[in-house]
Amino acid sequence: MSTQTRVRHFLADDDLTPAQQREVLELASELKQHPYSRKTYDGPQSVAVLFDKTSTRTRFSFDAGISQLGGHAIVVDSGKSQMGKGETFQDTGAVLSRFVSTIVWRTGSHQNLLDMAETATVPIVNALSDDLHPCQILADLQTCIEHLCPQEGVPGLKGLKAVYLGDGDNNMANSYMIGFATAGLDITIIAPKKFQPKQEFVDRAEKRASETGAIVSVTADISAVSDADVVITDTWVSMGMENDGIDRRTPFLPYQVNDEVMALAKKSAIFLHCLPAYRGSEVAASVIDGPQSVVFDEAENRLHAQKALLVWLMENQPR
């Protein structure tokens, strides 16, 4: 949160306390049942939706969600604006705050978000950065509740075991550690030693876990999938890494989520993937297209979780 402008932003998974995260998730469930029950942006008010990176699910889910909340999304791709082309992100944040009620930004460097938050007087939502993808985690938690503990709701997440296989040094792994620990889920990152999370993000996850009782662990041992309730993977080549010259396929081949890996988890386990997925690489077609896969429920929940986040931010700004 920017101490200079006293605005509550959502730039990282640990910007929400466990109690606040629960409020957002409970609201997400309510909005899924009653999509048009809130008109937070009635007027209509406008929301800036900025993209430095290409998007499908993020763009459609925010655009549709803002419309359902009574607002108007102004969607701008970075190539069609002056952002980052001489004007500072601090200046951009100050100016956009005069035009819109919220700023949603999918960017590269996480520092871009921090810079804009210094001066923005409206909430900023991280729609993805190189470090974190916190909106995706809210959708994933909503999906876990629906499939694993619908009666208990958010409290039912505590003590469940989630495992993430593949590239542990990316934004998804970082957010899974912090966001799942916030909800009380045990989370294990299973990755080759060369591709394990940076200590900074492990420390942040462990700090949150100390509040919720969750267990955060990192290993290269695939047997850690044993008895998992949730099995997760992500693409082995994140956006912007396609031409970095690093072989990202060979080290990850043993970490593909296939039928043998799923057999280690509980029979009731669900499979998550934020998409897009590459069948035959990080996940076998038999898994992502199989009965344990809930990836399309997960994708839909981007809409509901993000709507809930926008409503919560607008209703919980410091007075």
UniProtKB/Swiss-Prot annotation:
InterPro entries in the record: Asp/Orn_carbamoyltranf_P-bd, Asp/Orn_carbamoylTrfase, Asp/Orn_carbamoylTrfase_sf, Asp_carbamoyltransf_Asp/Orn-bd, Orn/put_carbamltrans, OTCase_ArgI
Compartment(s): Cytoplasm
Pfam families: OTCace (PF00185), OTCace_N (PF02729)
Catalysis: reaction(s): carbamoyl phosphate + L-ornithine = L-citrulline + phosphate + H(+)
Top-level class of the enzyme under EC nomenclature: transferase
Disulfide bonds: none
Transmembrane intervals: none
Gene3D superfamilies (UniProt xref): Aspartate/ornithine carbamoyltransferase
Coiled-coil intervals: none
Pathway: Amino-acid biosynthesis; L-arginine biosynthesis; L-arginine from L-ornithine and carbamoyl phosphate: step 1/3
Molecular-function GO terms, alphabetical: amino acid binding; ornithine carbamoyltransferase activity
Annotated positions binding carbamoyl phosphate: S55, T56, R57, T58, Q82, R106, H133, P134, C135, Q136, C274, L275, R302
GO biological process: arginine biosynthetic process via ornithine; citrulline biosynthetic process; L-arginine biosynthetic process
Amino-acid positions noted as binding L-ornithine in the UniProt annotation, renumbered to this chain: N171, D234, S238, M239
EC number(s) given by UniProt: 2.1.3.3
A cellular component annotation (GO) from this entry: cytoplasm
Keywords: Amino-acid biosynthesis, Arginine biosynthesis, Cytoplasm, Transferase
Function: Reversibly catalyzes the transfer of the carbamoyl group from carbamoyl phosphate (CP) to the N(epsilon) atom of ornithine (ORN) to produce L-citrulline.
Family according to the record: Belongs to the aspartate/ornithine carbamoyltransferase superfamily. OTCase family.
Protein name, per record: Ornithine carbamoyltransferase
Source organism of this protein record: Corynebacterium diphtheriae (strain ATCC 700971 / NCTC 13129 / Biotype gravis)
